[in-house]
Amino acid sequence: MRPQLETFHMAKISGRTESDIAFDREALNRGLCQWASATLRDLPWRSTRDPWSVLVSEVMLQQTQVNRVTPKYIEFLRRWPSPQALTQSTLSDLLKLWQGLGYPRRARNLFDSAHRIVQVHDGEVPNTLEDLITLPGVGPYTARAVLVFAFELPFGVLDTNVGRLLARWTGRSLGPKEGQDIADELVDPDRPWLWNQGLFDLAALQCLKRNPQCGECPVQEWCSWRGVGDDPASGSAGVSTGQTPFQGSDRQARGRMLKALTKGPVPAAQAAAIMELEGDIVRATRLISDLRKESLITVQEEALLLGDLLQ
């Protein structure tokens, strides 16, 4: 029995015509978009096409859960509704707001991106892949997400969840490039925003990593796996193997330091104690050095300060 979903790339193997495959793709997209139109989650960044708002949401959503991002996103845009507004503030102000989201390097990158957007792009978020990926911290995934969700351009946005879903649809393990090629090929050219948001919600709510709800899937007719046999998503495109434990990690220690600095300067001699690394001074020194290199903290007269005084 042939797979329920094939791509033009796979047609080279199966011998099916491109017209047959295009028919299947259009039927799949109709089913997905009809489902998405009725069931999409109500998330604040889905109510706007403002490129700056979309960029902020995508940076915040990197490795951070939706429920933690939502209040920070709303507060961020209330304070800094444009790149120009953020450039009038300080990195330390942004880092204070960022508390609770984790991975503060993203805040530094967003701060630097705002300055580049103002200085190089006249205050307008770029609308090409080539220009977007020149922004600090913006890679191909984030750039594609901005192009789709702000400018409604026909790109596929491949993240961990979507990579898992596409592998199951096609019934095969996918490398990163092939996964992205398939996402770009399958995207509905007339409704790229709705199609990609539908994929996100389908993958996040039904096509789960464990215990997928195959019987409730609105497009199960086109799925090659449907929960039977080995999961083709294992080790496939964009499918993560999970983060290292947070407890006892460098991330936790760095977070303690940055949280303390939101309340004011800290004597450098107290850094190890604040990070709960009194027994590992070498590690504490390395982490402080890393934070300085990333311009997240400044050392001045034997005191640590939040942000970069040279910003």
Whereabouts are the PLM-identified features?
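N-terminal amphipathic/basic-hydrophobic helices that include classical n-h-c signal peptides
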Residues: M1-K12
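N-terminal export signals and maturation junctions of secreted/periplasmic proteins
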Residues: I13-F23
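Catalytic cores of DNA base-excision repair glycosylases
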Residues: A22-D24, R30-Q252, A260, P265-P267, ...
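Residues in the recognition helix of alpha-helical DNA-binding motifs
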Residues: V146, L287-D290, L305-G307
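Short amphipathic alpha-helical interaction segments
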Residues: E278-R292
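A short, conserved structural fragment
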Residues: R292-L304
